[in-house]
């Protein structure tokens, strides 16, 4: 067994996998030509916090003020390296280089996981190579955010935790020689994972609960947990200081954005909501590019592929499938949404194409074994044809996501950035303004920005949830707001009401105030819509209003 696996762990296989991921990166990277930027406004929130950390020695979105704003403390620290060492360089390329340097190892880790588990070669190829052809997964590397790091650290922790067997180390069949080292390294990976995103803590629970099936001892668990705590405690301290809770306040703000509530809830309604959104947006539209129900066939095959991996339990690939399921389940009650471009569900983006292929492989094997026993010689050619078909289907997503990347960057640069430039030209530094999409405007403008999305100030959330946002702004002397909204087409194209945020924040049809429109920035509908249907990155317009507060007598009249 050892001799059979060893040739699959040589440099030529790693080069093949790396070449596939580099090709995927180059394919989407063409969307950056004359169009450098981030496809999401949230990307600039991380940049603002990293810059503030270096300039003001404070962790927060508001310069010089300790506050919330990011759900990933570890990613903020990584981005701050750019401002510490290369402050004059573009903030776009540093996270792209980091994510590119992480997404290639994610494929190599998948390959090693499959090889160590003894999966058939064609299964290993599907698991390692197909994500490189997924435009949606490769797109994560261009967001400037932490999701590729999260996926790669997860794969690393799973691989390390199962290294106790030492299958390739001669003369050490029990793995006792490297058990200490790999348990410490696993703790390091798990700690960094929990500091990258709070739901990463669940992988620690899963690995430690299954330690016996992974060939580990209680001592290994204690060592790994002790190392992980070194990372998790600082993350919890930061959250307590900025949000008043162990979890970042951004989760509550995002729950309001996607569900109009900040409460945790688990039930059939949240499971149904997340499942329906995952199927309609991530699978049916973003992967298959169809509105037809035939996409459900792919979902069924992927579920069957997941079952194929789980029936091999205990091994690394089955644990990866369990972790993907646990991660998805955590979002059913923590934040029942797929996020912009499916970014909250990186394992769906990573594993859907391979699971689809593995499901096909197993069905073909069953047919050859039981229904057509005389065709066993055709098993590998048939599985190879299935792999080519799934690869072609997956690769077709690359050009679509290149267009989505290009157009969403164009929207952020020609709407949000243009608004920031307008503010710098027409208002003195320190002018107080309430803003909903805070990333780009907060990074590039010199205004005193007041967050309206519930991501920064924990004292704001009670006002947001009780419909008293105008009162919050009036108490702080804020006379301007910038609201994101769609054009009139939002009523019929399913992208959202033009007055959604104005209504939810109680600025429209409010007898206690009047809004006077000052300036608006936006882009053409076709360009905006071509990216929005894939990423839901931002509304089409950013409009600046003056708030005229009315006295009680005037409001009563």
Identify what each model region corresponds to:
Residues 3-557:
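Membrane-proximal envelope and lipid/glycan-remodeling enzymes
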């Amino acid at each position: 067994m050892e001799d059979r696996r060893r040739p699959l762990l040589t440099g030529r296989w790693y080069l093949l996998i790396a070449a596939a991921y580099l090709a995927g990166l180059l394919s989407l990277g063409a969307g950056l030509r004359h169009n450098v930027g981030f496809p999401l406004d949230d990307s600039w929130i991380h940049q603002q916090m990293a810059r503030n950390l270096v300039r003001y020695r404070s962790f927060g979105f508001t310069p010089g003020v300790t506050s919330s704003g990011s759900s990933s403390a570890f990613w903020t620290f990584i981005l701050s390296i750019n401002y510490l060492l290369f402050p004059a360089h573009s903030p776009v390329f540093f996270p792209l280089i980091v994510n590119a340097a992480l997404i290639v190892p994610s494929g190599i880790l998948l390959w090693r996981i499959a090889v160590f588990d003894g999966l058939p070669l064609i299964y290993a190829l599907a698991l390692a190579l197909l994500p490189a052809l997924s435009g949606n997964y490769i797109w994560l590397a261009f967001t400037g955010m932490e999701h590729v790091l999260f996926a790669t650290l997860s794969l690393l922790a799973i691989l390390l935790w199962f290294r106790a067997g030492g299958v390739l180390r001669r003369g050490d069949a029990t793995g006792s020689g490297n058990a200490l080292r790999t348990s410490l390294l696993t703790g390091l990976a798990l700690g960094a994972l929990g500091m990258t995103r709070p739901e990463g803590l669940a992988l620690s629970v899963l690995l430690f609960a299954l330690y016996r099936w992974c060939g580990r001892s209680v001592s290994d668990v204690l060592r790994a947990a002790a190392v992980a705590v070194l990372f998790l405690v600082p993350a919890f301290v930061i959250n307590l200081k900025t949000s008043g809770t162990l979890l970042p306040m951004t989760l509550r703000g995002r729950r309001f954005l996607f569900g109009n509530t900040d409460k945790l809830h688990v039930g059939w309604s949240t499971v149904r909501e997340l499942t329906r959104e995952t199927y309609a947006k991530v699978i049916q539209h973003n992967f298959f590019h169809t509105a037809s129900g035939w996409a459900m066939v792919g979902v069924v095959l992927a579920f069957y592929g997941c079952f194929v991996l789980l029936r091999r339990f205990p091994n690394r690939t089955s644990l990866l499938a369990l972790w993907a399921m646990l991660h998805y389940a955590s979002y059913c009650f923590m934040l029942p949404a797929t996020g912009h471009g499916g970014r909250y569900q990186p394992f769906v983006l990573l594993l859907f194409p391979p699971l689809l292929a593995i499901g096909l492989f197993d069905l073909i094997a069953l047919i050859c074994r039981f229904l057509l026993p005389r065709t066993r010689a055709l098993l590998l050619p048939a599985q190879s044809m299935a792999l080519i078909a799934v690869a072609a289907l997956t690769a077709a997503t690359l050009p679509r996501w290149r267009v989505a990347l290009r157009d969403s960057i164009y929207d952020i640069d020609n709407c949000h950035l243009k608004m920031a430039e307008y503010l710098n030209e027409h208002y003195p530094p320190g002018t107080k303004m309430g803003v909903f999409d805070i990333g780009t405007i907060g990074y590039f403008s010199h205004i005193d920005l007041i967050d309206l999305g519930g991501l920064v100030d924990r004292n704001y959330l009670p006002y947001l949830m009780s419909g008293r946002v105008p009162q919050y702004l009036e108490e702080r002397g804020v006379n301007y707001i910038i609201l994101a909204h769609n054009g009139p087409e939002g009523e019929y194209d399913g992208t959202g009401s033009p007055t959604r945020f104005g209504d939810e924040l109680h600025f429209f049809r409010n007898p206690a105030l009047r809004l006077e429109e000052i300036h608006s920035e936006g882009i053409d509908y076709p360009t905006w819509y071509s990216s929005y249907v894939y990423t839901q990155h931002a509304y089409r317009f950013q409009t600046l209003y003056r708030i005229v507060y009315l006295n009680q007598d005037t409001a009563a009249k």
